[in-house]
């Protein structure tokens, strides 16, 4: 553990720097770095992430004792640079206390502003500034934040609004004003007293008046917020380890609410929604930062072009816009120039799109934060390619800048243009996060989760979102808010998740208790359908048809770049020609798994399949299989043709036969009629197929060994289709894979059937086709005896679903009953069926690859389980020397990027 727990910064000097984010968190490291490169930052200090972890081991009293000397010295350092004193009524220093983990977690943890205020300090500040409105506005904000974050003042139930907001609304009503900033000094003073009384009533404790007590309460509250529900959920979603901890940054306050020459804002060096190289953001005059970020007031645009675009969407004329909603570029031109120059400097320094917070205090600009901005998948790809073209980063960095999972967003459906032209627009908001979303209205996060769990698609409608809504936002198709701008919590989090979001739709009136939203005099209830266009900000009544997204030139360029560096081929799992074509458009270089059993469930095919199962002689089975042969051949013909010139790996029949027969009374009666036998006979045969443990029973190669005629029919269908295509001038490249091998003898037996059948087929068609015979490694014994199996197999395909199941001894279908407890108790960090277990299952794979190649140096190896599209699993496969990974068609781009990242 680091001995030093507190690092100071200010006045162009800092004890930390940008590369210390693991210790100082992203915020603390960047505050230090901005000081060092000449960006104006208020002085302060950062308490390390190690101290957060220490807090959870030793508790609050001990951590305060351990930190006391360093924090007191750091406060004195800040006092000296600001020329004022913490807690001194005549010349007071106020501070902000903010969280900051090494990975950005917007809004997930807690912030407190204006700390250090009490009645005496407030009076002293009024005497010093001559601005009582500013002082008591700051004071009521501090009591509200401290009451919420440190003392736990929350709404009592989900229908209630924040208890402090309820008090504010009542006081505004009494005074007859609409906006917080129009409250009189007397009303603000009244709010301070009402807030304190509410805290006393609910918690039983007086609001702390000693600034030092306030500071320690806030520091420890930020540490506690690392383990709040929303932070834990966000970390789970983003794959951030609990043990990283959060740093705490304490910084001298600068005030955006000191009057008309003060302001606060959030800005991005490029568009976080579409990646356009356009400086953009929002600001509020006479406000504090939380007003912008929390979406409590809908702010104005920073740039003139941004303001004009906003006005056009909102249907506001240029004259009205310029008069009533001027951009910062127009209202504060000199400050805007300084802000623009500094944002450009920061982007060039960090060589990435920056998300920045700033405050203007009486005409002086201060930066409070910079970080690499959260962005949509579309923006991620465009920004990476643009920075590459601008010479700011190289090709390898461009590949590493893109998150594989976020490519999924580019493949999401968009609204069909014809359907959109006929749809009814019911309101217009801000296009906070692009995409198309249709769903039923819900108003609360827990309802969104419940409805989603029931298989319903929902749109979460809120006045504004807060970090507590994270789980609901994750479950929803899209988010609609009445308040908040493009940089509000809803917008930033939705973009990070790739969720469609329309914010600041001011014409909507949300009633949580009635569970209704009124839009232009029409009332929509919970459960009604609406559609959101996150790209334009338009909201529509009902459901609108969607279509597949069109991929951009930037996407193609990124994929070409990946292919330039990758050492591993990406194939797809496809059971139909349509799936094969889709995957090919996404760049799949072949098929890593075709499941033949999926082809048997069409009406005519299932009848023949059931006939085969019912037969109790070889002749009877062969007669039924002869009916299946043309169907199978036609299926393989379509897939091999769609993947002409590419490897197509076809798995022989794998599931147990009981999966193909009906288990309900009506289904058995229908089957009896189709087969021309009695229902009793059907029941008897179905019962005879029952197994105690079917997943380890009569399936895979065991079916082919007991019924070799099944293997022969499938081989005949595969090679017959290939021969026909070769005669037509195509280049089919079939691979025949024997599933569930545990011993080399099983593979030898099945191989002999395949080779004998191949000889017959080639003689019949008068043409030969090159093909390969391989096996699936999905039983631990097969992995352990890979050297022997490789003598008979030309390739190994690792079926990681079953290999994981048999190595852990977990049933994939039943793991949900205990996995949540395992995750909570940290027995498992991730679901091993989603992320490959590299320590156990991975070692079996590594051993099998190495031992197999010791016997057969040209042995090709690949992975075809669900893990084939999961980025960390793909990187592991590349590391152990696999030739390919195979995944579902829509995960092909994700796997291509992950494979390239493994190579660079």
Which residues are covered by each model-predicted region?
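Nucleotide/phosphate-binding sheet-loop regions of phosphoryl- and nucleotidyl-transfer enzymes
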Residues: 1-423, 450, 456-459, 466-471, ...
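C-terminal accessory/binding modules appended to enzymatic or scaffolding proteins
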Residues: 13, 19-21, 433-475, 841-858
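Short beta->alpha connector loops at strand-helix junctions that form conserved
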Residues: 45, 482-484, 503-506, 594, ...
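Conserved alpha/beta-domain cores
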Residues: 98-99, 551, 561-904
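Long, charged amphipathic helices and adjacent flexible linkers at domain junctions
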Residues: 237, 399-452, 457-458, 526, ...
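Glycine-rich phosphate/ribose-binding loops and adjacent secondary-structure elements
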Residues: 364-366, 459, 463-474, 486-493, ...
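A short, small-residue-rich loop immediately preceding and capping a beta-strand
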Residues: 477-483, 501, 862
């Amino acid at each position: 553990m680091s001995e030093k727990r507190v690092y100071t910064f200010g006045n162009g000097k800092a004890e930390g720097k940008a590369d210390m984010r693991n210790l100082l968190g992203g915020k603390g490291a960047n505050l230090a770095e901005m000081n060092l490169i000449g960006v104006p930052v208020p002085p302060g200090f950062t308490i390390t992430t190690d101290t957060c972890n220490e807090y959870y081991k030793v508790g609050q009293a001990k951590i305060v004792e351990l930190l006391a000397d360093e924090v007191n010295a750091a406060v004195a350092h800040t006092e000296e640079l600001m020329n004022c004193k913490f807690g001194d009524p005549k010349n007071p220093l106020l501070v902000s206390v903010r969280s900051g983990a090494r990975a950005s977690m917007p809004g997930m943890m807690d912030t407190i502003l204006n700390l250090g205020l009490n009645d005496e300090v407030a009076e002293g500040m009024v005497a010093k500034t001559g601005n009582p409105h500013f002082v008591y506005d700051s004071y009521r904000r501090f009591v509200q934040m401290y009451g919420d974050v440190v003392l736990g003042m929350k709404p009592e139930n989900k229908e209630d609004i924040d208890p402090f907001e309820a008090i504010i609304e009542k006081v505004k009503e009494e005074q007859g004003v609409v906006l917080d900033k129009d409250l009189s000094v007397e009303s603000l003073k009244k709010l301070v007293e009402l807030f304190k009384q509410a805290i006393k009533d609910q918690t039983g404790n007086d609001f702390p008046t000693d600034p030092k007590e306030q500071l320690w309460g806030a520091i420890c509250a930020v540490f506690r917020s690392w383990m709040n529900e929303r932070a834990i959920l966000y970390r789970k979603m983003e794959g951030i380890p609990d043990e990283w901890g959060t740093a705490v940054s304490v910084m001298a306050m600068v005030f955006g609410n000191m009057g008309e020459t003060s302001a606060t804002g959030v800005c991005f060096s490029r568009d976080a929604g579409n990646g356009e190289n356009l400086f953009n953001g929002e600001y509020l005059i006479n406000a504090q930062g939380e007003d912008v970020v929390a979406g409590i007031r809908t702010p104005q645009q920073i740039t003139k072009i941004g303001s004009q675009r906003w006005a056009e969407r909102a249907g506001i004329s240029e004259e009205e816009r310029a008069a009533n909603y001027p951009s910062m570029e127009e209202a504060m031109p000199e400050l805007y120039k300084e802000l623009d120059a500094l944002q450009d400097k920061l982007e060039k320094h960090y060589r990435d799109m920056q998300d920045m917070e700033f405050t203007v205090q009486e005409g002086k600009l201060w930066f409070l934060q910079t970080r690499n901005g959260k962005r949509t998948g579309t923006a991620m790809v465009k920004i990476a390619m643009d920075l590459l073209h601008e010479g700011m980063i190289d090709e390898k960095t461009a590949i590493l800048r893109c998150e594989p999972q976020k490519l999924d967003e580019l493949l999401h459906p968009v609204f069909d243009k014809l359907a959109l032209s006929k749809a009814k627009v019911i309101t217009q908001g801000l296009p906070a996060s692009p995409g198309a979303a249709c769903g039923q209205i819900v108003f609360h996060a827990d309802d969104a989760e419940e409805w989603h769990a029931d298989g319903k698609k929902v749109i979460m409608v809120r006045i504004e979102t807060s970090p507590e809504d994270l789980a609901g936002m994750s479950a929803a198709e899209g988010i609609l808010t009445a308040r908040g701008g493009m940089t509000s919590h809803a917008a930033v989090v939705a973009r990070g998740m790739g969720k469609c979001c329309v914010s600041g739709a001011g014409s909507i009136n949300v009633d949580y208790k009635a569970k209704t939203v009124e839009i232009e005099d029409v009332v929509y209830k919970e459960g009604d359908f609406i559609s959101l266009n996150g790209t334009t900000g338009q909201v529509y009544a009902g459901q609108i048809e969607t279509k597949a997204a069109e991929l951009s030139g930037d996407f193609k360029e990124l994929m070409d770049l990946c292919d330039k560096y990758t050492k591993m081929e990406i194939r797809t799992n496809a059971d139909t020609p349509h799936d094969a074509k889709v995957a090919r458009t996404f760049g799949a270089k072949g098929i890593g798994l075709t499941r033949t059993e999926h082809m048997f469930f069409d009406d005519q095919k299932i009848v023949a399949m059931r006939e085969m199962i019912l037969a109790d002689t070889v002749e009877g089975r062969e007669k039924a299989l002869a009916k299946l042969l043309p169907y199978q051949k036609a299926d393989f013909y379509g897939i091999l043709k769609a993947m002409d010139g590419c490897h197509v790996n076809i798995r022989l029949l794998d599931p147990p036969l009981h999966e193909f027969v009906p288990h309900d009374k009506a289904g058995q009666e229908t089957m009896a009629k189709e087969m021309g036998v009695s229902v009793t006979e059907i029941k008897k045969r179905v019962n005879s197929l029952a197994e105690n443990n079917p997943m380890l029973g009569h399936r895979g190669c065991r079916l082919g060994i007991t019924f070799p005629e099944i293997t022969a029919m499938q081989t005949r269908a595969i090679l017959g289709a290939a021969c026909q295509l070769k005669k037509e001038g195509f280049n089919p490249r079939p691979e025949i894979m024997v599933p569930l091998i545990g011993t080399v003898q099983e593979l030898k037996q099945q191989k002999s059937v395949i080779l004998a059948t191949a000889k017959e087929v080639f003689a019949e068609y008068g043409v030969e086709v090159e093909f390969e015979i391989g096996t699936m490694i999905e039983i631990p014994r097969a992995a352990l005896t890979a050297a022997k199996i490789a003598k008979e197999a030309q390739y190994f395909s690792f079926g990681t679903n079953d290999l994981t199941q048999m190595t852990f001894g977990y049933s994939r279908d039943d793991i949900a009953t205990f996995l949540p407890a395992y995750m909570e108790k940290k027995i498992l960090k991730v679901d091993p069926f989603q992320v490959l277990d590299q320590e156990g299952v991975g070692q079996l794979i590594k051993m099998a690859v190495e031992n197999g190649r010791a016997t057969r140096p040209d042995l090709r190896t690949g992975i075809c389980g669900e893990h084939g599209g999961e980025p960390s699993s793909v990187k592991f496969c590349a590391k152990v020397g696999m030739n390919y990974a195979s995944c579902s068609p829509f995960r092909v781009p994700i796997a291509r990027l992950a494979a390239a990242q493994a190579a660079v």
